[in-house]
Regions:
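Protein kinase glycine-rich loop
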Residues: 18-22
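Short, small-residue-biased leader/transition segments that mark boundaries at the very start
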Residues: 2-4, 8-13
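A conserved alpha-helical element in kinase catalytic cores
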Residues: 37-80, 87-112
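An alpha-helical support segment within catalytic cores of ATP-dependent transferases
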Residues: 114-172, 182, 231
Length: 279
């Protein structure tokens, strides 16, 4: 059990909770600890993806505050979390520009994905399992005689996973709204908890912010992000772009038959183009 020393998650939940978010996967309350420190209580809903949230808690325990919010306690489907403030990386994009936001993300990922002495939690999901929807969609397309981006991306993903260099614990869903500026500096929240090459841990950033297609489709931005992340993570930018392309096609497979699928595929195609022409 990882209940906090001061109080169980369920006890804290009774202290003046203010509901601040109601998402498809959880209810999120802001609470005060006995000493007045703000904290977050996250109540998980009984959804199909609850395993992601539970793995994410194991990831936070493993990080122990290094680049991520601290998990202060957990009880059944309640989590007591360090309060990470209200300022997101998306605010930096809006106020100071995308370049500065990318540099902040690169610096944080360098800390988050650095080699660790701590053994990886056994609960973390292997990256290949995370890509199941892409591999299935690629098989379906191939069986139908279609050579699609899904087929191409599945081949690339399979090759990279088969000859992976060092595996690290990954956040798994990093984007501009779960990188927060806290009293301890920039931290991540809401991890999924994966194990894979570091480039896969950066891939989702190329598709964000979600409302800024002008950025996500811009070849200069794609190249600038690849270069910044390549330096920070010590990864070949070509491999990073391949991972970002494959990840976008995975996201598109999850979002099949909707507007999001088309958005994901358009950005993935732009990433593939930059990879082929600039590197």
């Amino acid at each position: 059990s990882t209940l906090s020393s001061s109080s169980a998650a369920s006890d804290v939940y009774k202290r003046q909770p203010v509901l601040i978010a109601d998402t498809f996967s959880s209810l999120v309350w802001k609470v005060s600890l006995p000493d007045g420190t703000p904290a977050i209580v996250k109540g998980l809903k009984p959804i199909e993806d609850i395993a992601d949230e539970l793995r994410g808690a194991d990831y936070l325990v493993w990080r122990n505050g290094r680049g991520a919010v601290r998990l202060l306690g957990r009880e059944n489907n309640l989590m007591l979390l360090e309060y990470a403030g209200e300022r997101m990386l998306s605010h930096i994009v809006a106020e100071h520009g995308d370049y500065q936001a990318t540099e902040i993300a690169a610096e944080l990922m360098a800390k988050l994905y650095a080699a660790s002495e701590e053994p990886l939690p056994s609960a973390l999901l292997p990256i290949r399992d995370r890509f199941a929807a892409l591999f299935q969609r690629a098989r379906d397309d191939q069986n139908a005689g279609c050579q699609t981006d899904y087929v191409h991306a599945a081949i690339i993903a399979d090759q990279m996973m088969s000859n992976a260099s060092e595996l690290r614990g990954l956040h798994g869903d990093l984007h501009h709204e779960n990188i927060m500026f806290s009293s301890r500096g920039w931290l991540v929240i809401d991890p999924v908890g994966l194990v894979g090459e570091v480039g896969f841990g950066a891939a989702n950033m190329f598709y964000d912010p979600a409302d800024r297609d002008d950025l996500c489709l811009d070849p200069r931005r794609i190249a600038q992000m690849a270069d910044a992340f390549s330096r920070a993570l010590d990864v070949d930018p070509r491999r990073l772009l391949d991972q970002a392309y494959a990840y976008g096609c995975l996201s598109a497979a999850w979002n099949a038959d909707g507007e999001e699928e088309q958005r994901d595929l358009a950005i993935a195609a732009a990433i593939k183009q930059v990879r082929q022409t600039s590197y």
